[in-house]
């Protein structure tokens, strides 16, 4: 994975984690106001991700599209808040269920980010093993020269 993809993965992870944290806190008091703040705070990340996803490969672009879809869905909730408040249907099951669905989807994005981090760790371990293998080969060749 190029460094750009890892950087974008980290940006996605930070953005998704911020959204996920805001969704968890939004249940307590006035979830729509906090959701609006989340959307506003994530928009700069989304712009950066859009710029980089045009350059990067398709798997990262798919994650970006999913995140964009979730943000658009959250924006719909923010726009619908005054109407919901007028009708006093804030506690209706279908809206709570929709927010829980978004939260579960954000968890899957966070898992993707962790997988990116794990991939980076695996690449580092492979590099270390390769270095150890070359050093071991040098030591063995040096020992065989000494015996001869």
Curated annotation (Swiss-Prot):
It comes from Arabidopsis thaliana (Mouse-ear cress). GO terms for cellular component: membrane. Disease resistance (R) protein that induces localized, salicylic acid-dependent defenses. Confers resistance to powdery mildew (e.g. Erysiphe cichoracearum UCSC1). It is found in: Membrane. Its main location: membrane. This is Protein RESISTANCE TO POWDERY MILDEW 8.1. GO terms for biological process: defense response to fungus; innate immune response; plant-type hypersensitive response; response to fungus; response to symbiotic fungus. InterPro entries: Powdery_mildew-R_dom (IPR008808). Induction: Expressed in leaves after powdery mildew infection (e.g. Erysiphe cichoracearum UCSC1). Induced in seedlings by the beneficial symbiotic fungus Trichoderma atroviride. It is a single-pass membrane protein. Belongs to the plant RPW8 protein family. Pfam families: RPW8 (PF05659). Residues 120-140 form a coiled coil. Residues 1-148 form the RPW8 domain. The chain crosses the membrane at residues 7-23. The keyword Ubl conjugation does not apply. Keywords: Coiled coil, Hypersensitive response, Membrane, Plant defense, Transmembrane, Transmembrane helix. Ecotypes susceptible to Erysiphe cichoracearum, such as cv. Columbia, are lacking RPW8.1 and RPW8.2 but contain in place HR4.
């Amino acid at each position: 994975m190029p460094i750009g993809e890892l950087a974008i993965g980290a940006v996605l992870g930070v953005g998704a984690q911020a959204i996920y944290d805001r969704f968890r806190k939004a249940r307590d008091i006035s979830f729509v106001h906090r959701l609006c703040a989340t959307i506003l705070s994530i928009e700069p990340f989304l712009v950066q991700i859009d710029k980089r996803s045009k350059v990067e490969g398709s798997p990262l672009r798919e994650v970006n599209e999913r995140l964009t879809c979730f943000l658009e869905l959250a924006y719909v909730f923010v726009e619908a808040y005054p109407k919901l408040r007028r009708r006093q249907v804030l506690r209706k099951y279908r809206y709570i269920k929709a927010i829980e669905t978004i939260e579960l989807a954000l968890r899957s994005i966070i898992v993707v980010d962790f997988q990116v981090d794990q991939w980076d760790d695996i690449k580092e371990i492979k590099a270390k093993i390769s270095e150890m293998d070359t050093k071991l080969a040098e030591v063995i060749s040096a020992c065989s020269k000494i015996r001869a």
